[in-house]
Structures are given as C-alpha cells and as structure tokens.
A protein has these predicted regions:
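Mobile active-site "lid"/loop adjacent to the S-adenosyl-L-methionine
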Residues: 94-116
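A short glycine-rich, Lys/Arg-flanked "PGG" loop and its adjoining helix->strand segment in the class I
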Residues: 113-127
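Helix-to-beta-strand junctions that scaffold the AdoMet/dcAdoMet cofactor pocket
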Residues: 18, 41-42, 125-127
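Conserved SAM-binding motif I beta-strand of class I
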Residues: 46-51
Length: 138
C-alpha cells in the first residue's frame, strides 16, 4: 500500500489516539483529520477543530454531520488554542500546514501564527501526548 501524507498521519493517529482522548485538530480544513479523531476518541472523547476560513469550518461541520460525529468546530486561529483548553490536558494535537484544497490560494498557514501554535499545542499536551505535523507546499 502506497502512503501519501494524509494516510501516513492517519496511520500514526490510529496507533496513538485511544478511546476517551482529548484531541485538537489545529488546521481543520475539509475535516478529514477531525473526523478521524472523533472516531478514534469515541463518545467518551473530545475533539476541538480550528480554522480561520468560514469555508473550511462549513466543510468540516458538513463532513461531521454526514458521519454523525461530534466536535467543537471553532472559527479562530490555531494560535489561540490555549483559550479553549487547559495546559497538559490534551492527548493529541494535529497540524496540516498548507492551504485549503480548492480554497483561496492567497490564504494559507503562515509561520508567524504556526510557530506560536506549535508552542501552544506543546503546552497543552499531557505528558506522553503526541503531536503530528504535516507540511504541504505549493
């Protein structure tokens, strides 16, 4: 089986996210990572998903609704995630840096907020928690 970036991240998450987990999708995009985190964390878990684009928020909510999954989908920068979770309470943080496929090519993740968000995510992680970071270019 040939793995692309998304499938490699998903395989990593399947190995590290258990039922009941508290997870953050820092870059919701089309919602694929959010949906997987919801399935892995299960009914006893919690998932927060962030994006700065209303289009991405709508796509994520639509996917979750179609799959009957629940997450807190938040229109805000991932750099602000510490406003939504306490330090050392999160099991998993996921970033997919790039831009929304099919979206405005002028809107993409930027170093200024992304570096800040990675630091915020690290502070939110429990000891033993995991962070997945995928980078897309173009």
């Amino acid at each position: 089986m040939q793995l692309n970036t998304l499938s490699m991240v998903h395989e990593f998450l399947k190995q590290h996210v258990a039922p009941g987990a508290f997870c953050i999708d820092a870059t919701a995009g089309k919602g694929r990572d959010t949906a997987l985190l919801c399935r892995l964390a299960g009914e006893g878990g919690r998932v927060l998903a962030f994006d700065i684009q209303p289009e991405a928020i709508a796509q994520t909510r639509a996917l979750l609704s179609a799959e009957r999954l629940t997450a807190d989908v938040i229109l805000d920068s991932h750099a602000n995630m510490e406003q939504y979770a306490a330090p050392e309470t999160v099991d998993c943080v996921v970033f997919n840096f790039g831009r929304l496929p099919g979206g405005d090519p002028a809107v993409f993740t930027r170093a200024e907020t992304s570096v800040e968000a990675i630091g915020a995510g690290a502070r939110l992680l429990k000891p033993g928690g995991v962070m997945a970071i995928a980078l897309y270019y173009g």
